[in-house]
Amino acid sequence: MLDIKKIKEILPHRYPFLLVDRVISVEDGKKVTAIKNVTANEEFFNGHFPEYPVMPGVLIVEALAQTSGIAMMQNEANKGKIGLFAGIDGCRFKRQVVPGDQLLLEAEITRMRGAIAKAKVKATVEGDLVCEAEIMFALSDLPK
């Protein structure tokens, strides 16, 4: 399990764009399960939508990408690198995410070849599928 302090040691993202609250499991150094607690105080609810707050789908995808980043950084060869979003395939949204929901984020690295990685990702709330996709990343060195 990784708390927010450990997550910040792995990911360069910070408020308001750090969208992973806790990592609850890491398997085989390539599969990560994490959570994002969605509260009524999220900045994006001010405009999306004031009378009908729904978490934007692109932010659900970003939370999944960040979870994938944590998975990629479990590989020693990737330490000091960042996974840049390079593409997405088969993305489907099945359920809205609203204040009070807890997103369960799952990412499994399915391919790692050179500087390119792919991850199969899935988000659920209380067992209901929210989103699934395959995300591609280009690994790059972090600036010093």
Swiss-Prot record:
Enzyme Commission number(s) from the entry: 4.2.1.59
InterPro entries attached to this UniProt entry: FabA_FabZ, FabZ, HotDog_dom_sf
What keywords sit in the KW lines? Cytoplasm, Lipid A biosynthesis, Lipid biosynthesis, Lipid metabolism, Lyase
Describe the reaction catalysed, as an equation. Answer: a (3R)-hydroxyacyl-[ACP] = a (2E)-enoyl-[ACP] + H2O
Q: Where does it reside?
A: Cytoplasm
Return one GO MF term.
Answer: (3R)-hydroxyacyl-[acyl-carrier-protein] dehydratase activity
On whether Lipid biosynthesis is a keyword of this UniProt record, the answer is yes
Q: Which GO terms describe its biological process?
A: fatty acid biosynthetic process; lipid A biosynthetic process
Per the record, its GO cellular-component terms are:
cytoplasm; membrane
Identify one Pfam family in the record: FabA
Catalytic residues identified in the record: 48
Q: What does this protein do?
A: Involved in unsaturated fatty acids biosynthesis. Catalyzes the dehydration of short chain beta-hydroxyacyl-ACPs and long chain saturated and unsaturated beta-hydroxyacyl-ACPs.
Similarity section:
Belongs to the thioester dehydratase family. FabZ subfamily.
- Recorded protein name is 3-hydroxyacyl-[acyl-carrier-protein] dehydratase FabZ
> Native species of this protein?
Listeria monocytogenes serotype 4a (strain HCC23)
Species lineage, top-down? Bacteria, Bacillati, Bacillota, Bacilli, Bacillales
Q: Which gene encodes it?
A: fabZ
